[in-house]
Regions:
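Sliding clamp-binding short linear motifs
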Residues: 1-167
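OB-fold and OB-like beta-barrel modules that bind single-stranded nucleic acids
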Residues: 170-178
Length: 178
């Protein structure tokens, strides 16, 4: 990140099981999703390699044997951002799709049935909601620094670059221990 890389949350169409680099984008691998089964994570990549990118949430659910918990994890981490839909909208859509889904309908169909689109009210998500979702699922925030989550803008009286100038002086600073 300090060398110009852009860290991206996992995406069902771009990420691999392990973290991968595509140009300047560093796509976190599905292996980092603490609550997602590793077999499912590997299957997402294998299925995409065999049959191409996922076109929609519906396409994903038809191709991957996954329950609502797994879909929710992927939605909360932003793995379906290619759809252009808000997370709240995707959550509702996932529940509507999975409530009547039959496993025998999984896989390629001769004729794709159109998914009924529902007109939902626009639900806003807060910057903090996304950051805390990332912390819960990955263990660390990606969309911001941990300092952005603090209630105060105070960052200390001295920065690392100034430590030598303040040798043997008492100073205050904020640090992120990894």
């Amino acid at each position: 990140k300090m060398s110009g890389g852009i860290i991206q949350n996992p995406c069902v169409n771009s990420s691999e099981f392990q973290t991968s680099l595509k140009g300047k984008n560093i796509f976190l691998g599905f292996m980092h999703l603490q609550s997602l089964d590793s077999k499912t994570a590997q299957l997402i990549c294998d299925e995409r390699d065999r049959n191409g990118n996922y076109k929609s949430l519906d396409d994903f659910i038809r191709r991957i044997p996954i329950g609502i918990e797994g879909v929710q994890i992927l939605i909360f981490i932003g793995a379906f951002r290619f759809t252009g839909k808000q997370k709240n909208e995707l959550l509702i859509e996932a529940r509507l799709l999975l409530i009547n889904f039959k496993p025998e309908n999984r896989g390629k169909m001769l004729f794709e049935e159109p998914v009924q689109e529902y007109q939902l009210p626009e639900l806003k998500r807060d910057f903090f909601e996304d950051a805390f979702d990332e912390i819960e699922i990955l263990g660390f925030p990606v969309s911001c620094t941990p300092f952005d989550l603090l209630e105060t803008k105070y960052r200390g009286s001295v920065f690392v670059k100034d430590l030598l100038k303040n040798h043997k002086k008492q100073v205050k600073m904020l640090a992120y221990l990894i």
